[in-house]
Amino acid sequence: MQKKLAIGIDIGGTNIRTALVDASGAVVGIRTQPTHAEREITEIMGDIAQGIGMLMSAHTVSRETVRGIGLGAPGFLSLRAGVIHNSPNLPTAREARVVSLVQSLTGLPVFLENDANAAAIGEHWVGAGQGARNLLCVTLGTGVGSGFILNHAIWHGSNDLAGELGHTVLVPDGLPCTCGRKGCLEAYVSATGIVNRTASALRAGRSSSLDACNKPGNPLTSLAVYEHAQRGDRLARDIFEETGRYLGIALANVLNLLDLEMIIIGGRVARAGDMLLQPAIHEVNTMALRAAYHPVHILQARLGDHAGVIGAAKTVFDRV
């Protein structure tokens, strides 16, 4: 029987998504399970292997029909060695040989990919980036993930560390970032950055209906900032406009460096839509040199939470 399916896995700090994906990029079946990231990485990988078995059983899929497993993981990776060196979202994953571990548990070929790269691969294959030769896919969530497609292929760089747009410095000596440095883009445009900047403005005395959302037992969230912005709260709207401007400045810098034809924006922060994207597009059109001669296509991602698993599965189809 032809091996027509691949398994794509997207490991997040909160949840793990596991999907059966066919050769056209369609998701045949998917399941979500909690990560419980504080556990030993061997336990997490064991849960992943068990989840794969449960998903295959639920869809009556035999091992013989599966080409392999694509493992999308966060952190600093060595793809050929199959190792997670370090990952803020997986604190016990230090020099973790996850590929050999999952292979031994499942008996299937396993291929490792950065989670943000996997999302970019998915969007390029069957999402908003179909047909584009050169693009950037940015995922705005708790942090900022990004992946570059150059000449129709994901760009890994010399040491599998390319694409860390979130840790390019936007403001010298600016806000502290989770990486330990100051002024990174992630500290300004991620969900965490939105919350921190809003809380700082409230502490400084800005008047806002968000005051009620910043109390003990009722922590401030980026969703609350968005909802209050929709209702017309001035501070909340200013925060999202400023977030869009910061994002647009970073994207214009990338365009001036790489002359990309398309930028895709995904993740839960991007669900703010025009409130975020319009100020970003304005900055790009003002600051990107190519904007004077060629249109810059900035699009919202299409695949949502499926982008990572679809892209991870594509890494299998590309190799087996």
What do these predicted ranges mean?
Residues 31-33, 88, 158:
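Short hydrophobic alpha-helix segments
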